Amino acid sequence: MTKLNELAPREGSTKNRMRVGRGPGSGKGKTAGRGVKGQKARTGVSIAGFEGGQMPLHMRMPKRGFNSRNRKDFAEVNLWRIEQAIAAGKLDAKAAIDAEALLKAGVIRRAKDGVKLLGKGELKSKLNLTVYSATASARAAVEKAGGKLTTTKPEAAQDASAEA
């Protein structure tokens, strides 16, 4: 039976740390296993994405799509977040709710190109909302609760998106 004071790691499973650069007699003196001069001999150097001459992963993967320069950046808000803010007393359900009110209540962080209303969650309060755009489910939920939803998105663009 093995005793606790006789426990030891398996033979060959541990290795002492090698202190490099401690004289020629140590076997790892002078250049400390880094070879002679050059970029890789210097401290703090590792070339990001370099895989030793093998084609790097970011170049092996195919390119796809593009980033539109005219992309709009909307603050997206779900119905449950608005309901939560009303319950917490941060928003007044009787007052008109727009991007500025949502920002002040901390529901959104910023509204660069406007607010888009999404339909997740249940709306219990009768609200008067003014947003840039809204999904069909969000619009239906606001109207079902007896509220009013006004969108500031240009009408021509709204009609085109409804047809698509």
UniProtKB/Swiss-Prot annotation:
Residue span of region Disordered: 1-49, 143-164
Cysteines engaged in disulfide bonds, as pairs: none
Record flagged with keyword Ribonucleoprotein: yes
Alphabetic keyword roster: Ribonucleoprotein, Ribosomal protein, RNA-binding, rRNA-binding
GO CC terms, sorted: cytosolic large ribosomal subunit
Pfam annotation, one family: Ribosomal_L27A
Listed InterPro entries: Ribosomal_uL15, Ribosomal_uL15/eL18, Ribosomal_uL15/eL18_sf, Ribosomal_uL15_bac-type, Ribosomal_uL15_CS
Gene Ontology molecular function: any one: rRNA binding
Signal peptide positions (record): none
Amino acid composition bias (Gly residues), ranges on this chain: 22-36
UniProt family annotation: Belongs to the universal ribosomal protein uL15 family.
Subunit structure: Part of the 50S ribosomal subunit.
PANTHER family: 50S RIBOSOMAL PROTEIN L15, LARGE RIBOSOMAL SUBUNIT PROTEIN UL15M
Primary role: Binds to the 23S rRNA.
Protein name, per record: Large ribosomal subunit protein uL15
Encoding gene (name): rplO
